[in-house]
Amino acid sequence: MDIRAAEISAILKEQIKNFGQEAEVTEVGQVLAVGDGIARVYGLDNVQAGEMVEFESGVRGMALNLEQDNVGVVIFGSDREIKEGQTVKRTGSIVDVPVGKGLLGRVVDGLGNPIDGKGPIQSTERRRVDVKAPGIIPRKSVHEPMSTGLKAIDALIPVGRGQRELIIGDRQTGKTAIALDTILNQKSAHAGADENAKLYCVYVAIGQKRSTVAQFVKVLEDQGALEYSIVIAATASDAAPMQFIAPFAGCAMGEYFRDNGMHAVIVYDDLSKQAVAYRQMSLLLRRPPGREAYPGDVFYLHSRLLERAAKMGDAAGNGSLTALPVIETQANDVSAYIPTNVISITDGQIFLETDLFYQGVRPAVNVGLSVSRVGSSAQTKAMKKVAGKIKGELAQYREMAAFAQFGSDLDVSTQRLLNRGARLTELLKQPQFSPLKMEEQVAVIYAGVNGYLDKLPVGKVRAFEEQLLGTLRSKHQDWLNAVRDSKDLSDANANTLKGVVEATAKSFA
């Protein structure tokens, strides 16, 4: 057999030349100790703060404490599979989640993994969960209304696109119901073709029962609202790091719409539970505790999250992200640590009261304590015209009602004020799942403010409202369309409305 040395050496040279030199280098550490959802890892010298790491069992974690001789890692999931001495490898990426329209209609966990059994997420883009909020220059002041469909809020405590409005109250006062109605109210906008009118909804459930979240998703599905919503669920049975990261993940998903010239609203339900999860993580990482045992940077935790809600200017695409954080108080104590923090960060609060809730005033909004610091500039002209007086009248009514308990002989003007106040309070009640369009609210509030309900028994106010709306919807659709399109109540339209309201009032006389 003839061995051709030259040919063999040529082949060898060719193969050596084409030999891939890229050897994959992974930085690996070792678990020193693990317990309570925290792992101490040795050997990850170059790990970044907030970087995702992977354990042997496939469970992931996030490096939070970078100390001199070890790294404190919080574990996203169960720590049962992790043993001392196991290896941990860096992934090289900061925690990120999938974003985009492919997430609409889906339920995901705090890391963006689907948990609704509908297959993988159709998304190509990923974003870091914790990014810097937009600066001052790319922003624009809030000027468009974000309608909730609730008379008590849209008339008295208006919310604008890009605003952060806190929903605060004790347990079982209807905080989630307000958020749910706001989401359902966007259905008519999504039925139309106007992209600018559409408002995509992101709902983050933090530390809630799984049954509650499932119920919420079912309502969205039944009402046809899930198709324009994303639900992120970090339930009570999930690890604390998942409850901590879920709001940031939801925010990243909402920012996709904001940065692409679309509009979104995000509900954090609720941030008290996120603060508790963060406190648990911080204490286990041996960070020094502060007031109420929360770590010193719990204010920064919420401020950096809520500052990401913004109305962008023309150069940045005109998108917006509106935030509705929810805070649960204990026995109406608004002066506790977390509530005061979040009140000072947000642009106003909707304060819900247990007493009002049990009196049947639902939504149980305390109009005196609730404010919207920027929303009034976002109200439509039509709503401004009719709702201007209502807040003052209700404030006077509450003041008088307190005095009226003592005295029986009241003068005529006081009697008239109490009379009107009781009817306006009745008028602002609204059953769940029945949001009203802006133009319908204008008609109803017009009737209340202009005294057409004063002679009516309080029990008939609801029937009056339904009859008025029924008449407008069946016979005056052109009026509703005119007010909706112009967003103003012209003199001609006001006269038409006056006629309809007077006719309705006569039928009740």
From Swiss-Prot:
Gene3D superfamilies annotated for this entry? 2.40.30.20, ATP synthase alpha/beta chain, C-terminal domain, P-loop containing nucleotide triphosphate hydrolases
What Gene Ontology molecular-function terms does this entry list? ADP binding; ATP binding; proton-transporting ATP synthase activity, rotational mechanism
Subcellular locations according to the entry: Cell inner membrane
What enzyme category does the UniProt record give? Answer: translocase
Q: Which UniProt keywords apply?
A: ATP synthesis, ATP-binding, Cell inner membrane, Cell membrane, CF(1), Hydrogen ion transport, Ion transport, Membrane, Nucleotide-binding, Translocase, Transport
Topology in the lipid bilayer: Peripheral membrane protein
- What Enzyme Commission number(s) appear in the record? 7.1.2.2
For this protein, the record's SUPFAM superfamilies field holds:
C-terminal domain of alpha and beta subunits of F1 ATP synthase, N-terminal domain of alpha and beta subunits of F1 ATP synthase, P-loop containing nucleoside triphosphate hydrolases
InterPro entries, A to Z: ATP_synth_asu-like_sf, ATP_synth_asu_C, ATP_synth_asu_C_sf, ATP_synth_F1_a_nt-bd_dom, ATP_synth_F1_asu, ATPase_a/bsu_AS, ATPase_F1/V1/A1_a/bsu_N, ATPase_F1/V1/A1_a/bsu_N_sf
Q: Which domain of life is it from?
A: Bacteria
Site positions for Required for activity: S370
The answer on whether this UniProt entry bears the keyword Translocase reads yes
Q: What is its main location?
A: membrane
Disulphides: none
GO CC, any one term:
proton-transporting ATP synthase complex
Residues given in the record as ATP binding sites: G169, D170, R171, Q172, T173, G174, K175, T176
Catalysed reaction(s) here are: ATP + H2O + 4 H(+)(in) = ADP + phosphate + 5 H(+)(out)
The record describes its quaternary structure and partners as: F-type ATPases have 2 components, CF(1) - the catalytic core - and CF(0) - the membrane proton channel. CF(1) has five subunits: alpha(3), beta(3), gamma(1), delta(1), epsilon(1). CF(0) has three main subunits: a(1), b(2) and c(9-12). The alpha and beta chains form an alternating ring which encloses part of the gamma chain. CF(1) is attached to CF(0) by a central stalk formed by the gamma and epsilon chains, while a peripheral stalk is formed by the delta and b chains.
The Swiss-Prot or TrEMBL record describes its family as follows:
Belongs to the ATPase alpha/beta chains family.
Its biological purpose is as follows: Produces ATP from ADP in the presence of a proton gradient across the membrane. The alpha chain is a regulatory subunit.
**What's the protein name?**
ATP synthase subunit alpha
Whose protein is this, by species? Methylorubrum extorquens (strain PA1)
Upper lineage is: Bacteria, Pseudomonadati, Pseudomonadota, Alphaproteobacteria, Hyphomicrobiales
Gene for this protein?
atpA
